[in-house]
């Protein structure tokens, strides 16, 4: 398969986007992925201090990535429609970031090995014994959560972790209809649809945003 890697956007590319947006809008809310996972936030903060961007580009560090960041963007659009000021939106987003987390069940240890998070020996053993790690991302910090034998067990464990999280920290939001679940997958269309249905069965009536 393809050798996949990531890198932050170049400062030039970021400024080109900002310049174009500022031709039409008075202010920009710029939402890079979590500062705990990428230097994109720090780079953007540095650029935003330049005179032409000062006070017009507001960089948001909501501690999120992937589907939760998508939800943050949808929430931002809703707040803009309601007439919220940009500074107030940034404040609310950064507070909300503390109330979101991601559980990630990994099919392979290969990318953790490439990123230096596990040794080649550990990755090889994980492959032999079909070990699937689960990671937890909260407030921009990525930590190991649990190791499971097989992907089905990993998915079940991730769902159980969310049940515990909701019961202990988000029961009021669930009761008020203010809870949102977010699902992502890198499988086939059929596998992705089955994954979402599996989540719906456990959390009936809870809105699910799927990426």
Question: Which role fits each region the language model picked out?
Answer:
Residues 1-13:
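N-terminal glycine-rich anion-binding loop in soluble enzyme alpha/beta folds
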Residues 13-41:
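N-terminal glycine-rich phosphate/adenylate-binding segment common to multiple enzyme folds
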Residues 27, 36-40, 44-50, 54-58, ...:
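Mixed-charge interfacial surface used for oligomerization/domain docking
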């Amino acid at each position: 398969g393809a050798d996949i890697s990531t890198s932050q956007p170049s400062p030039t590319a970021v400024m080109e986007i900002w310049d174009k947006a500022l031709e039409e809008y008075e202010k920009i809310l710029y939402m890079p992925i979590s500062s705990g996972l990428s230097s994109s936030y720090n780079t953007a903060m540095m650029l935003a201090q330049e005179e032409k961007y000062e006070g017009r580009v507001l960089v948001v560090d909501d501690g999120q990535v992937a589907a939760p960041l998508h939800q943050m963007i949808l929430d931002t659009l809703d707040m803009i429609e309601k007439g919220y000021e940009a500074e107030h939106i940034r404040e609310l987003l950064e507070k909300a970031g503390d109330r979101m987390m991601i559980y990630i069940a990994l099919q392979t240890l290969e990318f953790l090995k490439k990123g230096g998070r596990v040794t080649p020996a550990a990755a090889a053993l994980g492959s032999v014994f079909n070990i699937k790690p689960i990671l937890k991302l909260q407030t921009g910090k990525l930590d190991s959560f649990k190791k499971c034998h097989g992907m089905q067990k990993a998915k079940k464990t991730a769902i159980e972790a969310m049940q515990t999280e909701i019961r202990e920290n988000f029961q009021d939001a669930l009761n008020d209809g203010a809870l949102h679940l977010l699902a992502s997958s890198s499988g086939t269309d059929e596998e992705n649809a089955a994954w979402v249905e599996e989540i719906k069965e456990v959390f009936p009536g809870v809105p699910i945003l799927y990426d």
